[in-house]
């Protein structure tokens, strides 16, 4: 049995063996990669196929559950609608129905959304070594706050500013400095590639999959339908050939990055224990001239190669400073962040969306999920703060009362909906279900999520609009 080393790979081959009535002994080979070293290693570690019978049963249960749910509930809901006079076929599926529900729920949240006006108070303090802005942190019992801790009474802000101006002396209550590191972003799985390409080029997930498949068929990149972001250590030796090829790829940025890469760095990506059925999508050792590719192929090859090269750049290192000022029995906080070593993030600076009309620059290093943002504003970070010590005196110099308004949750795009499918546990309140859904990496698979979104659109259950292809029911 040489099927993929996951439950679906086990099922596909075992079903054939059962169908033909095989009675001979069967051995199982577990292949995570198809390079010579990996294949030889797997051939030297063959297992009894019966050891994986539970994996087969797991996939069989999934297959039959999908069939029973689809066959029975699709008929039930379709007939129910026809009794109401609606001549419509309603396909119900274990994956497609909750996927559509995400879009419908977001639409209802938008319909029910009522913006809230609120205010932030910022104070400019002067210290002997320089000036800095600090943001007021109201106490929980402060009058004029809503249930989310936002100041909704402008009069409170204006009164505070007057009080501070009349008594301008402040003192530094604490100074906290910490050196922090951001590890190299991992190489790409299919879903992370689809999300990244959606941000960078507004490509829909199916376009990304189709393009990655073409690159795979040209032997320029590895297997595209992977859910893994790690690499087998026995492929670490291929880095020399891959980086040398990228240095001569014809793409100016890739060439420069590959030439400057530190080939002695071994990032966290090289981890045998984290490999699933397939390893992360990376460039192969086959040389590529990007000028021979279509624009879509070139863009997807660029993202895959960029993430691979990032493994050979250092960690992003920065110093974070937090200053707390006390004045008139209130606290004001200033945050500063100074980059010490740009590291791998130098590859992701000023990545501008090709189709973004409003000029926004998507953060291609952001690997957070698809949930809407925090309710409260984060304190802005300054590039530099003056050198201050605890108990130093500071003087109130100026103030700013900023009027803001809460923003509605963003509509899904095909790429963010795909990410939400993978992280469906974030949208579930039941703690037990949340754990189970997180353990199985959400609903759908790397190979099916894009197709499910496309099917919902083609059947008219969802529609896209605008350059960003936002989704609505």
What are these regions (language model features)?
Residues 2-425, 431-461, 466-470:
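Toprim catalytic domain recognition across nucleic-acid enzymes
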């Amino acid at each position: 049995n040489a099927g993929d080393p996951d439950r679906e790979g086990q099922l596909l081959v075992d079903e054939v063996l059962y169908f033909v009535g095989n009675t001979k002994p069967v051995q199982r080979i577990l292949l995570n990669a198809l390079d010579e070293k990996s294949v030889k290693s797997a051939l030297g570690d063959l297992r009894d196929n019966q050891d994986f019978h539970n994996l087969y049963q797991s996939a069989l249960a999934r297959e039959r559950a999908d069939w029973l749910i689809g066959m029975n509930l699709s008929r039930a809901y379709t007939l129910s609608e026809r009794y109401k006079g609606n001549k419509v076929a309603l396909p119900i599926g274990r994956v497609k129905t909750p996927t559509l529900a995400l879009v419908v729920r977001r639409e209802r949240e938008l319909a029910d959304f009522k913006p809230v006006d609120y205010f932030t108070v910022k104070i400019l303090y002067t210290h002997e070594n320089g000036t800095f802005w600090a943001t007021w942190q109201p106490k929980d019992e402060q009058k004029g706050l809503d249930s989310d801790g936002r100041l909704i009474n402008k009069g409170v802000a204006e009164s505070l500013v007057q009080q501070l101006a009349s008594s301008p002396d402040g003192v530094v209550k604490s100074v906290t400095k910490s050196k922090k590191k951001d590890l190299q972003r991992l190489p790409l799985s299919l879903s992370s590639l689809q999300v990244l390409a959606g941000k960078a080029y507004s490509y829909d997930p199916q376009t990304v999959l189709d393009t990655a498949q073409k690159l795979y068929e040209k032997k320029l990149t590895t297997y595209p339908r992977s859910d893994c972001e790690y690499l087998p250590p026995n492929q670490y030796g291929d880095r020399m050939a891959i980086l040398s090829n990228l240095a001569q790829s014809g793409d100016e940025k890739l060439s420069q990055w590959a030439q400057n890469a530190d080939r002695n760095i071994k990032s966290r990506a090289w981890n045998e224990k984290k490999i699933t059925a397939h390893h992360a999508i990376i460039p192969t050792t086959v040389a590529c001239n990007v000028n021979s590719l279509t624009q879509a192929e070139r863009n997807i090859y660029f993202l895959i190669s960029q993430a691979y090269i990032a493994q050979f750049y250092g960690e992003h290192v920065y110093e974070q400073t937090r200053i707390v000022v006390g004045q008139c029995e209130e606290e004001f906080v200033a945050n500063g962040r100074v980059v010490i070593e740009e590291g791998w993030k130098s590859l992701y600076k000023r990545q501008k969306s090709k189709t973004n009309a409003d000029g926004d620059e998507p953060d291609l290093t952001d690997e957070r999920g698809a949930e809407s943002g925090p309710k409260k504003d984060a304190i802005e970070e300054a590039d530099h703060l003056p050198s201050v010590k605890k108990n130093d005196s500071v003087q109130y110099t100026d103030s700013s009362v900023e009027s803001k308004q809460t923003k509605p949750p963003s509509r899904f795009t095909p790429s963010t909906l795909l990410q939400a499918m993978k992280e469906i546990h974030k949208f579930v309140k039941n703690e037990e279900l949340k754990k189970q859904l997180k353990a199985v990496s959400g609903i759908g698979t790397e190979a099916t999520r894009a197709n499910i979104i496309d099917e919902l659109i083609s059947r008219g259950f969802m529609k896209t609009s605008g350059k960003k292809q936002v989704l609505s029911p």
